[in-house]
């Protein structure tokens, strides 16, 4: 996908058209490209990445504050950290085809940089920085509503949350509690993968169960289910 094709895509998909197209070009330009094109004016993406990181932090914090009025500071902080982890940004860069619009040097292109997570994480932040400078925070919010924020309802960010530690902190607020995880069931699936069921108990009282394709994932699912029960029943 050329830069012109990418511009057409974001216009059609997100109704985004840059007023200053040099900002978009800068956000999608890697340093090695400029090294190989010394006659070309402009910068690489790194300054916009710096700005985009701060914009993401602010807008995500504001979004969570408004969406979850009953959450305490610890819950808001944990979810914000999960959402602005750069590990998730590579996923969203691919989702909106930022990877296809990057201007790379020949060596980086040949080495597979276009699909390198670390670069895609940086480019996401640079794109957010460019969009903020060009059109302001409201347009950034609209874009994130269609991408990052929409993923909350799919439980996408659960992979970045340590539910076992959260459960331990919740249960031990009033003193020591013996928390135990047990593998209750193991099932062989038709695609040769395994499905595990795990339980979590506190002081020998089972709180919840969860399933996953590994024991670790099943225990995490059990902890998440237990937290949900505790949060829905504050007197437990």
UniProtKB/Swiss-Prot annotation:
Mg(2+) binds at residues 49, 122, 125. It is found in: Cytoplasm. This is Ribonuclease 3. Pfam families: dsrm, Ribonucleas_3_3. GO terms for cellular component: cytoplasm. Keywords: Cytoplasm, Endonuclease, Hydrolase, Magnesium, Metal-binding, mRNA processing, Nuclease, RNA-binding, rRNA processing, rRNA-binding, tRNA processing. HAMAP family: RNase_III. Belongs to the ribonuclease III family.
